[in-house]
Amino acid sequence: MNEQQKQAISCGKGVNVVYSGAGTGKTTIITNRFAYLVNKEKVDPSRILAITFTKKAAKEMQFRILKLIDSSLAEKTNIYTFHSFCNKFLIQTLKKRFIIDDDISYFLKEFLADSKLDINLAKQIIDNFKNTFADFEINKLDQDERLISLCEHSLLNKDEEYSTLKTQLINAFISYEKNKILNNKLDFHDLLIKTCNLLSNDNDLLNQWSEQFQHILVDEFQDTNQIQYELIKMLVTKNKNLFLVGDNNQMIYRWRGAVNGIITALKHDFNVPKSNEFFINQNYRCDQNILAVANQILLKIMAYEKQVKTEKNLLFSTLNSDKKPVYFQAESVENQANWIFNKIKALNQTEKINFKDMAILFRKNRDITTMVELIEADGTIPLPKQKSYFNQLVKLQRVLIAISTRTNLDIKRALQALKIWSNDLKELWKQSDKTNLFDFLKWSELNQKNHSSKLKATGYFNLLIKLAEDQQINLLFTELFKKLKVDQTIENLLWKKLTEFQKDKTEFSLSEFITSLALEFDSIIENSSDTINLLTVHAAKGLEFEAVFIYGMNQGDFPLFLSQNQNDEQHLIDELKLFYVAITRAKRFLFITAVLQINNNSIKPSSFLNYINKSEYLDIATINYVLEQDDDFFDSTKKTDYTKKLRKESLDIIVGDLVTSRYFGKGVVVEVRDKEVLVAFKDTRYGMKWILKNHKSLTKALY
């Protein structure tokens, strides 16, 4: 550890704030602080609470702490996410268990399906709810106001439908809340709200829990939202020993409730002296050339936020190479993708970097879909299965919830996941005298002779319930894995989780397992195979890769501007911070790409690129089509003049011509543009590629 870290770790009691820049070892600092308190200050580990944001981060923290303290103390450590801590608190306090069901999007689809709203409009609102509403940590009294705000956000220029939509959404929310109460369910933001309500309304309970924890450590504090901050303040009521690690320049979750200026608010609330503030700026992740670019963006953020510009705010590293980050501007999305593919393959073959240690980062989710299609067409880069894994887990969770609650909505959702729900079944249910879907399924199984073709599948759900009631858990999950076609990788992980969960238990609790599964989604589906990482920048926060490609640095895309925020300075700052986070995910190689046109429409490069002194800090890829896997990029002694690889005259090529590439073999021309041709290569490893007509590697061939 360096001196900056040592000073922070060995600080005294009270509220201490550690400003730890990207890659400066936040986890190292917080885990060593935990160990310092136990080993040096002789604090009982059961009286230390460490909180972070993801299950994966919590597991990593626990793993590191147990290497620093006596292993016999493992059972006494309290390392949680905010949600898992609140879940434990509610179980211990209320002496009852809840089912965590955060699938608000399904509920809203069901509710809005019967409305007269335009289907595209309804989908737009559902997507907004899915992306933002489920993360709002709000007082119940503010919900109507937030819903109205969300309507305004989604319905610009749709005044005639606004009133209807507002009413529909508020009614949907009320129904959603009632459904949870009736079925003993909580969503993730309920966990926090219930915990805070109980603590704020019961002084004895507050004293008990704030007395229990002598020290509280919080990682990534800049990402906390208002209710999380209120929870922390209540938990330090007695002892007031709080150790916070964060970086305000990486605050990228304002859109889901993180409070801008939360660190400033805390300093005011707790009257934190300057002596209790620590600045860590030695980066252990990135090459100094990458940090030079990051610091250019950091200076702009500081200028916008009127921060004092000092050296302690800028990052430095002792990791130095002569490889500058590369900026590449392609003529089209396809050219951009091909260039990225070839660089990835070159890194894999020449630098021996595994695919899993490389990432393509996107500002928008929909760009990932486009890239997946292009990678599949290329056929040479292995794709991750995280999205498929996530969908499989969601379906499994839906079925388990239905087995537990047996409500109409949950059973219908489960039958859809099992591909049993059909129009015939729906019609027969309407015709029957059964209002409860579970009763109807039992009735239908007994009456299959009358409607055998339509009801033959309904007995399957009843079988699942019988297996659960008889505690035949292994048979239950074997059936589910087979029916839902769960991937072997996920199946193996779930069997392991089931084994661990059932250890020392005399009876299997389905609701308890559902909650455990919901709290660990992120750690179950993490990428463990050697496949390329395709992530939004938000999803990449906290991760690091040997090589990073920042995709689509174009104005309007990154920064992403919608009509309602194009003149919003705070939004611009948020986008700059997002760019800073993207840059600092890279350890050795950084590539930034943009395009000149999309769908034949010209598009400008991102204005953020103007904040970087390109001639000093970037290598500019001046040719848009470097098709070969070029070793020269990795050899600092070679400076390639790509213009030497072009003819003065372009080939005269038409659709249907047979051509030969020196690098990819024979292929057929399937599309021709002014300067380039799209070639479908016979070797399926290469798929289709755009090639400049005047590239020397391309020649016409004879049939």
Curated annotation (Swiss-Prot):
Q: Among the record's GO biological process terms, what is one? A: recombinational repair
Q: Which GO terms describe its molecular function?
A: 3'-5' DNA helicase activity; ATP binding; ATP hydrolysis activity; DNA binding
Which superkingdom does the taxonomy of this entry point to? Bacteria
Swiss-Prot/TrEMBL keywords: ATP-binding, DNA damage, DNA repair, DNA replication, DNA-binding, Helicase, Hydrolase, Isomerase, Nucleotide-binding
What residues does the UvrD-like helicase C-terminal domain cover? Answer: 294-542
**Uppermost EC category:** isomerase
Please provide one cellular component term from the Gene Ontology annotations of this protein: DNA helicase complex
E.C. numbers: 5.6.2.4
Swiss-Prot/TrEMBL catalytic activity: Couples ATP hydrolysis with the unwinding of duplex DNA by translocating in the 3'-5' direction; ATP + H2O = ADP + phosphate + H(+)
Q: What InterPro entries does this protein's entry cite?
A: DExx_box_DNA_helicase_dom_sf (IPR013986), DNA_helicase_UvrD-like_C (IPR014017), DNA_helicase_UvrD/REP (IPR000212), P-loop_NTPase (IPR027417), UvrD-like_ATP-bd (IPR014016)
Indicate the segments forming the UvrD-like helicase ATP-binding domain, all copies.
1-287
Annotated ATP binding sites: 23-28, 285
Write out the function statement from the record: Has both ATPase and helicase activities. Unwinds DNA duplexes with 3' to 5' polarity with respect to the bound strand and initiates unwinding most effectively when a single-stranded region is present. Involved in the post-incision events of nucleotide excision repair and methyl-directed mismatch repair.
Q: What family does this chain come from, according to its entry?
A: Belongs to the helicase family. UvrD subfamily.
Protein name (Swiss-Prot/TrEMBL): Probable DNA helicase II homolog
